[in-house]
Amino acid sequence: MESTGMQSTGQRVVITGAGSGLGRELALRYAREGARLALADINDDGLKETRQLVADAGGWSFSQRCDVRDFSQLAALAQSCEERFGGVDVLINNAGVASGGMFWDLSLEDWDFQIGINLIGVVKGCKAFMPLLLAQGNGRIINIASMAAHIQTPGMSNYNVAKAGVVALSESLLAELQPLGIKVSVVCPSFFQTNLLDSYHGPDHQSKNDMAKLLESSPISAADVADITYRESEADHFMILPHERGRLALEQKRADPQVIYQEMFKLAARRLQQG
C-alpha cells in the first residue's frame, strides 16, 4: 500500500479498476475537486502511474492491489478506507473486462470469467463497503455498466448479460438504500476511447476487431465519460447515459423495439458472413 500527494479534506472516494482507462480518468476528475482517493487495481504499474498523475494534479491518494473476484481483498480495501479516511463518501465499482464471441463459441469458462468480474465483482464491491455506508447513513455508490445492458449487440452475449445485471443490481440498491440516505447511480456509456481491449477475453478475434473499430470511432473519450459521471452523479441522477447516440437508441427501443432488433439482425448476419 502506497500513498502520494498532500492529503485534503475533500470527499473520500474509492475507485476499482483505477490503473487505467475510465478508472484513471475518474481519479483525476475527483482529484481536481479535492477528493481523497483510494485506488484499487490488479495492475500495479498502472496504479503507480495513476497515483503519480493524481499527485501532479494536486490530489492525494493511496493505492492497494485488489482483485474484485476476491471478496477478502475488497474487504481489506474497505478496512483500509475506514482506517485512513474514517469512512467513504463515494464508492465507484469500475473494474471490468471486455469479452466477445458468438454464443455457441463462448465456453462456460468465458461466461464465468466475464460474470465473475463485471457483475459479481460489483456485487462484492457493494457488499464489502455496505457496513461502512450503513453505519454512516450516507454516501454514494456509482456502478459502471454499459449501453450493452440496454442494446444487446450480437457477438458479446456474456458481456451484455453481465452489464444488464449491473443495471438490475443498481436499480435494486436504489430502492433499498434510498430510505437509508445512501444514493446510487449507474453509468451506461457506449464504446469510448480507452484501453478496454487490453483486458479482452474471448474465443475469436473478430469480436475484438469489431470492438476496436467502435472504440476508435467514438466521439468522446474516457475523460469525457468521467466528467459526465462526476457531474450527473453529484446532481443525484440515477441512470447516467454519456453518449447521445446511446440515449437516442434507448428511446427508439422503448418506442418501437422491433426497429432495434432489425438492426441487430443485420449486425449478426454481417458478422456471420465475415466468419
Where are these regions (language model features)?
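Active-site helix of classical SDR
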Residues: 126, 162
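Conserved glycine-rich cofactor-binding loop
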Residues: 19-20
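Substrate-binding pocket helix/loop in short-chain dehydrogenase/reductase
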Residues: 102-103, 107-115
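The beta1-alpha1 cofactor-binding region of Rossmann-like NAD(H)/NADP(H)-dependent oxidoreductases
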Residues: 44-45, 65-76, 108
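SDR active-site lid
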Residues: 179-244
